[in-house]
């Protein structure tokens, strides 16, 4: 038990804290605000408080809880909405109304709800950390596997029969090698700053299919990969992340709204229950965990929300699921680090950010990955992290963007000009990159199309050629270009408008399956080959531009039937044959 001696914003200094540990959770003041010790000097402790500290004064008590900041992991996580320190917002609303009272806590998982438990082990079985004790159908999409906590191993001496239990009831007893008995419930706690263990890390060879053509074809994200979406305000970071949360082929989505506007979380809450998962036909909310830590919530909790989210994601990974984690936005978290570092009077680094910004960002992204999980069976799970970065004024040379680019392998650079032109997703194809292309091309060749890489590279080269030609057009106008280059501009316009641009509000075009993506690409590249042949045979470029098939190619993105899209190849060939006859080529 200590006493407060100083309060500066979210930081509180207390003395008489002998015996306290780093990162221990404490209750601050008479109201009992939740805080975490971030520095110890002698018997003084510096505490960052996760709630508003107005009204707290020196002399009030500080009480240690003996545990570090931990999350509860068990059935009840999915469809829930938490704040940055895993307090269920729905429950807090029932306790204190629309405005959250300070010092309030509620258990993260519902204590009175009964879950139907089916055991998967029997008495006498040997178990190790990560083994599946039983399963609970948490939602109609996700079967929640109840795991043996990583620190437990031994022999099952008692296991609950199939039936309905609450998370507080003991469902198994394990006799450890030293003879002690460990009682296991459906949930366990895990400190958020410690990454959950696994057996082995696997290379990221499987793409995370998002249904967004720009991303899947040109700048692919791998399962277990890391990606950053930097962009100025209004360029579509949040909308892009919502699209990925909706349609990516991860089985579980953890969405962290970290320091962004509250109405963006409201959008998720309103849209996701109405939207259907394309694979199961069930509401998307049933596979989603939301962590809302909006811009008007206390600054210190932003850091906690990032760690809370990734720990929950690792827990579902350990069950053998592919998890996608969206962090929107990591810049706000970095700003919180800057504010707390300033109040700690630490030496500032670049632009006032703390010198350890790079290592903090790296520490977060390193928890992504595709792994073989703990346990006797060889389960494979993954956590793919997609972090939005909001640099002030869209300046990509800013420290948060630069330090993020050092650790992530995929960079989707959003462009305000494209966003203004209503080009969605506004990912600039000349500035973005993905370092996973070589690793995942085998998957595409085996499962979708053996020519995927060749087509992708051809299209990319065309788009880069277009950028060079645009420079010339700006100076001397399009009429000065030779026919061959005019023809390239026709094809690249088709690539931009009919392939890269996507309609997030159209039922068909919001999600484009891999087979359709490859077929659309083939249609456009076939048009390109025929165009080049026509130009070489002396057909005027204006005639090519007027071909009726061009309009059909422009509409193919709204066509759900892949065979009808494929039929455009024959139609293109036929119309070019007629042109060749007309011009005697």
From Swiss-Prot:
Family: Belongs to the ATPase alpha/beta chains family.
Pfam families: ATP-synt_ab, ATP-synt_ab_N, ATP-synt_ab_Xtn, ATP-synt_VA_C
Molecular-function GO terms, alphabetical: ATP binding; ATP hydrolysis activity; proton-transporting ATP synthase activity, rotational mechanism; proton-transporting ATPase activity, rotational mechanism
Binding residues annotated for ATP, in chain numbering: 231-238
Subunit structure: Has multiple subunits with at least A(3), B(3), C, D, E, F, H, I and proteolipid K(x).
One Gene Ontology term, aspect cellular component: plasma membrane
Lineage top rank: taxon: Archaea
Subcellular location(s) per record: Cell membrane
Entry's EC annotation: 7.1.2.2
InterPro entries: AAA+_ATPase, ATP-synt_VA_C, ATP-synth_a_Xtn, ATP_synth_asu-like_sf, ATP_synth_asu_arc, ATPase_a/bsu_AS, ATPase_F1/V1/A1_a/bsu_N, ATPase_F1/V1/A1_a/bsu_N_sf
Organism: Thermococcus kodakarensis (strain ATCC BAA-918 / JCM 12380 / KOD1) (Pyrococcus kodakaraensis (strain KOD1))
Keywords noted in UniProt: ATP synthesis, ATP-binding, Cell membrane, Hydrogen ion transport, Ion transport, Membrane, Nucleotide-binding, Translocase, Transport
Alphabetical GO biological process terms: proton motive force-driven plasma membrane ATP synthesis; proton transmembrane transport
PROSITE patterns: ATPASE_ALPHA_BETA (PS00152)
Protein name: A-type ATP synthase subunit A
Protein's UniProt keywords contain Transmembrane helix: no
Known function: Produces ATP from ADP in the presence of a proton gradient across the membrane. The archaeal alpha chain is a catalytic subunit.
UniProt xrefs under SMART domains: AAA
Topological type in the membrane: Peripheral membrane protein
């Amino acid at each position: 038990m200590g006493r407060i001696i100083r309060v500066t914003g979210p930081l509180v200094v207390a003395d008489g804290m002998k015996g306290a540990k780093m990162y221990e959770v404490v209750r601050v003041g008479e109201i009992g605000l939740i805080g975490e010790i971030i520095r110890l000097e002698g018997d003084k402790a510096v505490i960052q408080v996760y709630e508003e500290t107005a009204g707290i004064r020196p002399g009030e008590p500080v009480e240690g809880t003996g545990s570090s900041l931990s999350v509860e992991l068990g059935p009840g996580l999915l469809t829930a909405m938490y704040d940055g320190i895993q307090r269920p917002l729905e429950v807090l609303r029932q306790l204190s109304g629309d405005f959250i009272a300070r010092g309030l806590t509620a258990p993260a998982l519902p204590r009175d709800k009964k879950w139907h438990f089916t055991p998967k082990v029997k008495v006498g079985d040997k178990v190790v950390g990560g083994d599946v004790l039983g399963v609970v159908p948490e939602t109609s999409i996700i079967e929640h596997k109840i795991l043996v906590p990583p620190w437990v191993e031994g022999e099952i001496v008692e296991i609950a029969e199939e039936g309905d239990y609450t998370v507080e009831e003991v469902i198994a007893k394990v006799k450890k090698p030293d003879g002690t008995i460990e009682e296991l419930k459906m949930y366990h706690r895990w400190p958020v700053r410690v990454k959950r263990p696994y057996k082995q890390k696997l290379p990221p060879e499987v793409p995370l299919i998002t249904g967004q053509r720009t991303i899947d074809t040109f700048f692919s994200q791998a399962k277990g990969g890391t990606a950053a979406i930097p962009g100025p305000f209004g360029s579509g970071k949040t909308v892009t992340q919502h699209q990925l949360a909706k349609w990516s082929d991860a089985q579980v989505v953890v969405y962290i709204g970290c320091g962004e506007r509250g109405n963006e979380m409201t959008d998720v809450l309103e849209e996701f229950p109405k939207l259907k998962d394309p694979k199961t036909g069930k509401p998307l909310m049933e596979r989603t965990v939301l962590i809302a830590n909006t811009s008007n919530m206390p600054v210190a909790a932003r850091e906690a929300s990032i760690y809370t989210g990734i720990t929950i994601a690792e827990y579902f990974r350990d069950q053998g699921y592919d998890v996608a984690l969206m962090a929107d936005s990591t810049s706000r978290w970095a700003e919180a680090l800057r504010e707390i570092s300033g109040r700690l009077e630490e030496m500032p680094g670049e632009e006032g950010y703390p010198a350890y910004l790079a290592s903090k960002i790296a520490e977060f992204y390193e928890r992504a990955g595709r792994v073989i999980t703990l346990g006797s069976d060889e389960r494979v799970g993954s956590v793919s992290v997609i972090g939005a970065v909001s640099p002030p004024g869209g300046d990509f040379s800013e420290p948060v963007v630069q330090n993020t680019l050092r650790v992530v392998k995929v960079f989707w650079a959003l462009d305000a000009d494209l966003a203004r032109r209503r080009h969605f997703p506004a990912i600039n194809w000349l500035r973005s990159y993905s370092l996973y292309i070589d690793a995942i091309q085998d998957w595409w060749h085996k499962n979708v199309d053996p020519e995927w890489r060749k087509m992708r590279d051809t299209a990319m080269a065309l788009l880069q050629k277009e950028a060079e030609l645009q420079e010339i057009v700006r100076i001397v106008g399009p009429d000065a270009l030779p026919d061959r280059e005019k023809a390239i501009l026709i094809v690249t316009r088709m690539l931009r408008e009919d392939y890269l641009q996507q309609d997030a509000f159209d039922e068909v075009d919001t999600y484009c399956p891999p087979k359709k993506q490859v077929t659309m690409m083939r249609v456009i590249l076939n048009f390109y080959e025929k165009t080049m042949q026509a130009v070489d045979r002396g057909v005027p470029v204006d005639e090519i531009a007027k071909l009726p098939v061009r309009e059909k190619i422009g509409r193919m993105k709204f066509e759900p039937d892949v065979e009808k899209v494929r039929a455009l190849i024959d139609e293109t060939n036929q119309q070019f044959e007629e042109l060749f006859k007309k011009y005697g080529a």
